[in-house]
């Protein structure tokens, strides 16, 4: 089993790096505002048609453009969901969503969280899935990538005040990166058996003679961008454990690769844009180290089995509860770590049925800000926040003003860094406390004791960090939970983006200082270790008390 796990992890990372490197080169061209080969003429026509100028924006203008797009998308999506019954492509005549559920779902997909307090096949029409959710899957992913583009330019430019044109960045990211790659993935999914149609649900008679209604729909197209954009919201309630979303071992591998593809490629793009590829590789190695350790822990925990099931006479010595037999323990464990290391939230197994330690690792990966590869764009700008914190700590130890890529890190940058890093922990801890203090919050818990608290902590961690996965034992479709999690999702997304853009605006105007003998090298093993230590330290200090009340207490209560 150990050899199989090692081969699975190694082959996954090898294929990922092979695919990510050329994509990183294309992303680096977009960061430099250089059109990809053969599209310059098309872009000129697009700019004229859409009324987009070549005028570059400062950080406030860039941020305002992103906020305007997302708030407009939020309003439109809410209306689509609320008045769904009056809109076309609704063969099952599904009614509109309640106000609190429509708000929760709209915020969820606009913020790239894709938390789902509903069952897709019994709640949403094809029009809502296509014109509402799928569109936001593209736009929310493009928003995250645009933010990290602006931050990277802040490090690579000097003595200017502009970070690029947000509208041009969004169009280029969507048309030349997200759409073509998603199209290729969707065609592969269709070939593997994922449905792509607008047919009404199909009644069938099973081999046992029972009547059943098979859901249909444009699944493959939404599934592709769901994974590529680290969105995670499933067309069906069972998400990627459903055979219509994830039918084979090949689609399972493709989905995991799609989740990490752009986050890994952005590391290569960062190195190329900075003029020092070692800088991007250092971040990639730090992410990969934490990722491999986390996968190993989850695999080990799930292979040990569940003592309660073993005592009840379970056939398998490994923990197969909540897992698909076509994937098994190892692939399910890898998928769980991939989807929570990134801000994806798609699942091919029920995380609520993992062992105490096996479920704690995905929860912790979300709580540290999903900086281990992370979401498209958000993972890299989240890790760069920890880089700034790491060089600040190193500067304190050696008595020098901290620098990164030749830019001095001053008080303003550190204040914004601290604010961005502290936003989500405050939401998680205060939100979990509020839920546990109120009857409306506690009534949603399926299980008592430590596992019930873990369900609450996981849900708020998932929402605040824009992941979207859940310990499904929590009945979260209530006005209290819909409003609480919508607030956490919105503030967790834009409460980080705003200080990140402020950091970019401050750094872009600074001059690049030449390296000296006292400059800390930020691409060697020493700095990689310091960066990993910083991530672990912040995660440990912030969440160990809460984790001790949930998964840790549950683990030590096992027979």
Curated annotation (Swiss-Prot):
- Principal localization reads membrane
**What GO biological process terms does the UniProt entry carry, in alphabetical order?**
potassium ion transmembrane transport
- The membrane-spanning stretches of this chain are 5-25, 27-47, 63-83, 132-152, 170-190, 253-273, 283-303, 327-347, 356-376, 379-399, 416-436, 484-504, 524-544
Which Gene Ontology cellular-component terms appear in the entry?
plasma membrane
Give the domain of life. Bacteria
Give the bilayer topology.
Multi-pass membrane protein
**Where does it localize?**
Cell inner membrane
One matching Pfam family: KdpA
Please provide the record's keywords in A-Z order.
Cell inner membrane, Cell membrane, Ion transport, Membrane, Potassium, Potassium transport, Transmembrane, Transmembrane helix, Transport
Q: Does the keyword Cell inner membrane apply?
A: yes
The GO molecular function terms of this record are:
P-type potassium transmembrane transporter activity; potassium ion binding
Family to which the UniProt record says this protein belongs: Belongs to the KdpA family.
Subunit info here reads:
The system is composed of three essential subunits: KdpA, KdpB and KdpC.
Per its database record, what is this protein's job? Part of the high-affinity ATP-driven potassium transport (or Kdp) system, which catalyzes the hydrolysis of ATP coupled with the electrogenic transport of potassium into the cytoplasm. This subunit binds the periplasmic potassium ions and delivers the ions to the membrane domain of KdpB through an intramembrane tunnel.
Q: What NCBIfam families does the record point to?
A: kdpA
| UniProt protein name | Potassium-transporting ATPase potassium-binding subunit
Q: What is the native source organism of this protein?
A: Salmonella typhimurium (strain LT2 / SGSC1412 / ATCC 700720)
């Amino acid at each position: 089993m150990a050899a199989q796990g090692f081969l699975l992890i190694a082959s996954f990372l090898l294929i990922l790096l092979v695919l990510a490197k050329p994509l990183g080169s294309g992303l680096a061209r977009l960061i430099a505002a250089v059109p990809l080969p053969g599209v310059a003429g098309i872009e000129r026509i697009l700019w004229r048609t859409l009324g987009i100028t070549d005028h570059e924006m400062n950080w406030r203008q860039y941020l305002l453009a992103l906020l305007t797009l997302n708030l407009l998308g939020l309003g439109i999506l809410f209306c689509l969901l609320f008045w769904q019954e009056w809109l076309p492509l609704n063969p099952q005549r599904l009614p509109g969503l309640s106000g609190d559920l429509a708000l929760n779902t709209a915020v969820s997909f606009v913020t790239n969280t894709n938390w789902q307090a509903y069952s897709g096949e019994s709640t949403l029409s094809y029009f809502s899935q296509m014109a509402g959710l799928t569109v936001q899957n593209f736009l929310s992913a493009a928003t995250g990538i645009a933010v990290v583009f602006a931050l990277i330019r802040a490090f690579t430019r000097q003595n200017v005040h502009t970070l690029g044109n947000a509208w041009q960045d969004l169009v280029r990211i969507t048309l030349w990166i997200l759409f073509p790659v998603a199209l290729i993935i969707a065609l592969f999914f269709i070939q593997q058996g994922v449905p792509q149609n607008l047919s009404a649900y199909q009644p069938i008679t099973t081999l046992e003679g029972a009547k059943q209604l098979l859901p249909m729909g444009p699944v493959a197209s939404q599934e592709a961008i769901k994974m590529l954009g680290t969105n995670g919201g499933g067309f069906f309630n069972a998400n990627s454990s459903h055979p219509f979303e994830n039918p084979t071992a090949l689609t399972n591998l493709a989905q995991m690769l799609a989740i990490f593809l752009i986050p890994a490629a952005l590391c290569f793009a960062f190195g190329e844009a900075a003029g020092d590829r070692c800088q991007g590789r250092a971040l990639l190695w730090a992410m990969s180290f934490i990722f491999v350790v986390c996968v190993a822990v989850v695999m080990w925990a799930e292979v040990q089995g569940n003592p309660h099931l073993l005592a009840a006479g379970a056939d398998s010595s490994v923990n197969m509860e909540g897992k698909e037999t076509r994937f098994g323990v190892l692939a399910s464990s890898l998928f769980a770590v991939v989807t929570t290391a990134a801000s994806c939230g798609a699942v091919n197994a029920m995380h609520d049925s993992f062992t105490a330690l096996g479920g704690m690792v995905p929860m912790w990966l979300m709580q540290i800000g999903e900086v281990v590869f992370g979401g498209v764009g958000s993972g890299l700008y989240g890790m760069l926040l920890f880089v700034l914190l790491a060089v600040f700590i190193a500067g304190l130890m050696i008595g020098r003003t901290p620098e990164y890529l030749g830019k001095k890190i001053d008080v303003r940058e550190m204040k914004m860094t601290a604010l961005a890093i502290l936003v989500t922990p405050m939401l998680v801890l205060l939100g979990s406390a509020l839920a546990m203090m109120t009857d409306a919050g506690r009534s949603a818990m399926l299980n008592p004791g430590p596992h019930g608290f873990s369900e609450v902590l996981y849900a708020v961690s998932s929402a605040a960090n824009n992941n979207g996965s859940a310990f499904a034992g929590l009945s979260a479709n209530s006005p209290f939970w819909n409003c609480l999690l919508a607030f956490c999702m919105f503030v967790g997304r834009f409460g980080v983006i705003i200080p990140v853009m402020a950091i970019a605006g401050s750094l872009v105007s600074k001059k690049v200082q030449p390296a000296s003998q006292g400059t800390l090298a930020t691409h060697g093993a020493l700095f990689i270790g310091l960066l990993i230590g910083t991530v672990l330290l912040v995660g440990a200090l912030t969440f160990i008390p809460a984790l001790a009340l949930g998964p840790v207490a549950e683990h030590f209560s096992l027979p």
